[in-house]
Regions:
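Rossmann-like adenosine-cofactor binding region
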Residues: 52-53, 170-271
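C-terminal helix-to-coil terminal segments
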Residues: 88-100, 117, 180, 263-321
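Conserved beta-strand positions in the Rossmann-like core of class I SAM-dependent methyltransferases
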Residues: 164
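Glycine-rich NAD(P)-binding loop of Rossmann-like domains
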Residues: 118-151, 181, 185
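Phosphate/diphosphate ligand-binding glycine-rich loop within oxidoreductases
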Residues: 42-119
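N-terminal glycine-/charge-rich "phosphate-binding" loop or analogous flexible N-terminal tail
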Residues: 1-41, 306
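Short acidic/histidine-rich motifs immediately flanking catalytic phosphotransfer sites
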Residues: 38-43, 58-62, 197-202, 225-228
Length: 321
């Protein structure tokens, strides 16, 4: 089979797939050329490329398989009409959620200790400053309590923090929750603003579903405890850009660490980055362990496709019947 990755430069990803699928051709295309590539591919791996209705006009395409979780850029309705399955890889257990959770905690520490200023002080020979804020005895609010949110909570267990989880439907609803992971409180979406009022650190881990676009907007930021930090390792659209910029400029938000943005690549000259923002280039899941684990899961689903077996983690399972 021919498998096309809709991005260039992901050598580790390509190598992982080729090692797992030695009989298959692994190709690359520019994101804008996804429809053209689909005409000559059995499987597309979109990464961050928009997969529009035009892609599903292909007579050869048999599967759109994401190398990770995010499906927000894929026209799943068009895929369903064309009878083409769309699948992803759950974050937990693949190395993805685990890697993302580690970066989220690193970003909290960078914000609390004002790492950019600390580095600047070093080169200016100013030692003993700035005075930072510890994670210990802080309140961390995790907005979105799926696989990634749970892995963040799991890793915070030894830090002496109070953890409040917020999910759309609250405890006992939605995706399976690991009972071995401790949180001090778990509330549904109605409790979001009350939770934000307690937060020293807000970690956004919610998917960019239609219901979540702009979830952290002016009202949510107005509800936040003054001087709180915010981390986004989910998707840019979950936070309202204008509201975040206003919150940073007013000082209500003490700082933000962003691994995801509203457009990617993001403009390094954007006014937002002149505020107290630590940006990273969407690397939360970019680790050797994640590439290897997700690659194995992707390859396993492609082998199921080849064998005519039931695909796993299909977003439109009705096409499989």
């Amino acid at each position: 089979m021919k498998i096309t990755i809709c991005a260039a430069g992901f050598k580790r990803m390509r190598d992982a797939l080729q090692a797992a699928l030695p009989r298959d051709e692994i190709a690359e295309c520019a994101p804008a050329d996804a429809a053209l590539a689909a005409a000559d591919s059995d499987v597309l791996i979109p990464i961050m490329a928009p997969i529009t209705a035009a892609v599903f006009q292909s007579q050869r395409l048999r599967l759109v398989q994401q190398y990770g979780v995010g499906l927000e850029a894929i026209d799943i309705d068009a895929a369903t009409r064309a009878g083409i399955p769309v699948a992803n890889v759950p974050s937990g257990g693949s190395g993805n959620a685990e890697s993302v959770a580690e970066l989220a905690i690193a970003q909290m520490m960078m914000l609390g200790r004002d790492l950019p200023q600390a580095q600047a002080n070093f080169y200016q020979r100013r030692f003993g400053a700035p005075i930072g804020r510890a994670l210990w005895q802080s309140c961390v609010v995790i907005v979105g309590y799926g696989g990634i949110g749970q892995e963040i909570a799991r890793r915070l267990a030894g830090w002496g923090v109070r953890i409040v989880a917020v999910s759309r439907r609250g405890p006992g609803a939605g995706p399976a929750q690991d009972g071995s992971v401790h949180v001090d409180r778990h509330v549904d979406a109605r409790g979001l603003h009350a939770a934000l009022a307690e937060a020293d650190f807000v970690v956004v881990a919610a998917p960019a579903s239609a219901a979540n676009v702009g979830l952290i907007g002016r009202e949510a930021i107005a509800a936040m405890k003054p001087g709180a930090f915010i981390v986004n390792i989910a998707r840019g659209a979950v936070i309202d850009y204008d509201a975040l910029l206003e919150g940073l400029r007013s000082g209500r938000i003490a700082g933000a660490a962003l691994d995801v943005f509203w457009q990617e690549p993001f403009d390094p000259d954007d006014p937002l980055l002149r505020e107290r923002v630590i940006p990273t280039p969407h690397i939360a899941g970019v680790t050797e362990e994640c590439f290897r684990g997700v690659g194995q899961a992707v390859a396993a689903n492609i082998e199921r496709l080849r064998a005519g077996e039931q695909l796993t983690n299909c977003a439109n399972p009705e096409v499989l019947s």
